[in-house]
Amino acid sequence: MAVLTAVDLTNASRYAIHMHRLEFISRWRTRFPHILIDYTLRPASSDDDYYVPPKLADKALAVKLAFSKRGCVSMSCYPFHETGVVSNTTPFMYMQTSETSVGYAQPACYHLDRAAAMREGAETQVQSAEFRYTLDNKCILVDSLSKMYFNSPYLRTEEHTIMGVDDVPAFNVRPDPDPLFPERFKGEFNEAYCRRFGRELFNGGCSFRWWESLIGFVLGDTIFVTFKMLANNIFSELRDFDYKAPSSILPPRPNVDSNAILAQWRSVRDNATDLEFEKLFNKNPTLNDLGMIVNGSPVQITYTAETGFTKTPIAYNYRGNERARVEHFEALDRSISDQDLESIITSFLEDYALVFGIATDIGFDMLMSGFKSMLKKINTSLIPAMKHMLLSTTRRVTVRMLGETYKAALVHSLNVIAIKTLTVTAKALTRIAIQASSIVGIVLILLTLADLVLALWDPFGYNNMFPREFPDDMSRTFLTAYFESFDNTTSREIIEFMPEFFSEMVETDDDATFESLFHLLDYVASLEVNSDGQMLNLEEGDEIEDFDESTLVGQALATSSLYTRMEFMQYTFRQNTLLSMNKENNNFNQIILGLFATNTIVAFTAFVIHTELIFFIFFVIFLMITFYYIIKESYEYYKTIDLLF
């Protein structure tokens, strides 16, 4: 009997992802009307997106959802101030540790979900990261760590006592204008920094004037710099060093009304939105419903925040191509029952080669025990949601159709988990959470940047610290370490953040799973031929209207968490082999044990009769040897088990 292949299951998941993204647009509008978004809708392509069954050609979409330029700015959060990390009570302010003002604690840090931010234990759990909108219309994650290092000298070290490293004015910081490196921040010397080391800002670097170089040559640079710093009142500033105002020649930091900034952030609205049109997204619309068929030709709809809609003709064939069929001789069993639904799910879960192979393709790399544990958690929520979906749908559902939908839903769940845990974006969010949790977290991140050779830093500034290339070289080193901290590959990937990465603030996982099941059922029911060319005939057979979810969950958990028959046979074979080997190695144990037991009794009897010490010593020795041979066989068995497992 033909079933969905791994290719079909993956395509079903892709279809569900795009259709869920379509519904997510209106949910985002409801939850975050002040965070503006752009989106693009186009008919799905079998070549570029996923296989489109002919029955779905009039509704299969490819949806792209992204932050607009203003939305990207609204989502940005820089979580560091002069001496630490922001908390859930830190107001938005500017710091002026250099000639460049830097804002921190933007509203997105803790006001995306204010209730969650104020819970106990969430004081330092920032809800967003720092983003930048690029020329190619992407909201990307930037390297906030290098910005922090350039702008907050206090955070460079843990003890804050290293002269010339953390008791200095900051570098001027600005985003790199090079479009090839949009994530990077560039550091630049300023007059206050150069003055701290008895130098002048010249041509982008810190240097002596020509006549100061002559005096330094005669007196020695150390002596000359000491006198110059004394004349410039540097030592008195260092005695009462203020990390928030590190130099008297820096401008004062800007004053800002943080409450007004927060109110302005919340009051943003997109007046170009067509809410009536977007309500269609939750009604399983067709291309005609969305106005994507103009004069009989398909078009792509692009919405730009605060601007409106544009329609662009598409050149590819959006209509699903019918797959080639091969002769299939297996007859359909028309006596399918509720018991067979259990068989479908159980046999699928026991086919670890297929399921584990799909998970590996998605990106999971774990032991089989860890994979089974994940399957157990998925099934606990997936099967009840599947029953809820079955009772809610108006479609006629057969047992095989529901069984194949379960398989697709399991693969889809793996895809969703992978997006949240394995992607570069997920790793970036984890890294941000560690950085923003405490100063210790910052130090730990710095220690992991193996390519950041801090040995080049000269604390007293006599060698490598002042050429104008120095901040730029350090910025490039930070950027290299920034990418290498995400994975061990040499690939460089710009990390684009999209609204769906914040889905946990918009919907629960259970709701998302339930809604996705309807899309998966639609896709599975629309498939007539699998990727191998076999006829599926999923609509043939008895209809299923309900099933015992408790029994099915128990069956699935047992299958995905306990041993299969093959694993059990392998386990018992190993145990029998160990027992046999252990017995062969201890063939004469009983004879030796009997001899030493007899000697023990004889020695004890002699000691009682003659009361001489030598007999007591023999008695103790024989007793210890007898005890050893009693436990020898068991000891060697468990020792072998410990070494092997």
UniProtKB/Swiss-Prot annotation:
How does the protein's chain sit in the membrane according to the entry?
Multi-pass membrane protein
What is known about its subunit structure?
Answer: Interacts with the PIF complex composed of PIF1, PIF2 and PIF3.
**From what organism does this protein derive?**
Autographa californica nuclear polyhedrosis virus
Q: Tell me which family the UniProt entry assigns to this protein.
A: Belongs to the baculoviridae p74 family.
Q: Where in the cell is it found?
A: Secreted; Virion membrane
**GO CC, alphabetical:** extracellular region; membrane; viral occlusion body; virion membrane
Where does the chain cross the membrane?
A: 437-457, 590-610, 611-631
Give the protein's function: Plays an essential role for oral infectivity of occlusion-derived virus (ODV) and also functions in host midgut attachment and fusion by binding to a specific host receptor.
Which biological processes are named by the entry's GO terms? viral life cycle
Query: What domain of life does the UniProt record list for this protein's source?
Result: Viruses
Keyword flag Transmembrane: yes
Known Pfam families for this protein? Baculo_p74, Baculo_p74_N
Keywords attached to this entry = Membrane, Secreted, Transmembrane, Transmembrane helix, Viral occlusion body, Virion, Virulence
Q: Tell whether ATP-binding is among the UniProt keywords.
A: no
| Major localization listed first in the record, in broad terms | secreted
Any idea what this protein is called?
Per os infectivity factor 0
